């Protein structure tokens, strides 16, 4: 872990621990609210609420996974532990981005499907939505997700040479840079979702629950 000083690594390790605790609490709150909404009669409005809350909870899981994997990287004691954490980070970023924004399957993108439908009904959210959409598109261009690494990490390969080569060529600096860019963007999405909850979900629930 030559890219990080020991002091910086320790400070970051502790900060990530605090962030994980906070996100765990948000996840529990989201699930409590989602369960309450599930108990309401199904209609267009409750469907919108579920979409927002499900999106928010999925983001919590992505954040928890990526922060835990980076924390694992910071605490690694062996070369392979570092490499295992790095390939886990890459897989989480690839799968997280696919779930948030999609690569080619837009029907599976909650940003383009769930959140776009909300923005259509709440124009005050449009400017932030378009700004973040642009950031997500740039992220895919500038923060290249390594598909081969993802595939080898999840499925291995019939040829162990390919897996060994992938592990040997892993760059901690490159993966850390990707993590920084990805986390900044996904945090922006998370803040937008929290704003959406304040505007859409909270006022509705205050009259129903």
What function would you assign to each model-found segment?
Residues 136-165:
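Histidine-centered, metal-coordinating catalytic motifs and their short helical/loop contexts
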Residues 1-142, 168-209:
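Amphipathic alpha-helical interface segments
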């Amino acid at each position: 872990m030559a890219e990080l000083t020991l002091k910086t690594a320790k400070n970051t390790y502790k900060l990530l621990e605090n962030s994980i605790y906070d996100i765990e609490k948000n996840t529990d709150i989201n699930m409590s609210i989602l369960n309450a909404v599930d108990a309401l009669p199904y209609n267009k409005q409750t469907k919108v609420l579920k979409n927002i809350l499900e999106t928010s909870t999925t983001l919590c899981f992505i954040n928890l996974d990526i922060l835990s994997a980076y924390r694992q990287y910071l605490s690694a004691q062996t070369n392979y532990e570092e490499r295992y954490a790095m390939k886990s980070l890459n897989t989480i970023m690839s799968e997280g981005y696919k779930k948030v924004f999609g690569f080619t399957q837009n029907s599976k993108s909650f940003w383009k499907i769930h959140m776009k439908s909300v923005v259509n009904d709440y124009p005050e959210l449009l400017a932030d939505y378009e700004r973040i959409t642009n950031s997500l598109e740039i992220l895919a261009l500038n923060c290249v997700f390594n598909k081969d690494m993802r595939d080898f990490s999840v499925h291995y390969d019939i040829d162990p040479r390919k897996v060994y080569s992938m592990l040997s060529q892993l760059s901690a600096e490159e993966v850390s840079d990707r993590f920084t860019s990805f986390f900044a963007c996904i945090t922006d999405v998370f803040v937008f979702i929290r704003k959406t909850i304040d505007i859409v979900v909270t006022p509705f629930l205050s009259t129903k629950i």
